């Protein structure tokens, strides 16, 4: 099914469709922003397209146990439980942008996650439960935490870590909060790449 190019929201469009195998064709969707719970519970879903315009992605593929690859859009803002329980998920393309400040349980239970994922961070980024019980099998996942100095300037006075924290302090706090939720069998490595030009 091809979605029209002018569509802006597809919230719960295929919610609970257990027979759906291929997700909708979103090639022409340059304005699609809300995909909240679009494929929630689609247990047979094997492929999905997520355009870079998408912002609202909470629960988009929650429980899609046959999905193996996903793309994270550059405009993402809300990704709470987006791929929760996607037990076959292996590959992630794109990166988690600094605009995303809601990512609780994002990849929880995705035991085969592997490869490298970059997360662009600000003082408002929270990742404490995003990878709980993830990457417990397979070849392992490397997460690169990258400090977004420009975006952090915009949120300096409202950030969860305050406006006086350095890039290293923010990234190290994020790393510690993430590691505290990893299961004992997780094969996840976190590295930080602080931008020393933060000013």
Name each model feature, range by range.
Residues 9-15, 34-40, 58-62, 80-84, ...:
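Consensus positions within tandem repeat domains that build extended binding/scaffold surfaces
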Residues 1-8, 18-33, 43-56, 65-77, ...:
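Structural signature of tandem-repeat unit edges
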Residues 153-162:
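Short, flexible/disordered intra-domain loops and linkers
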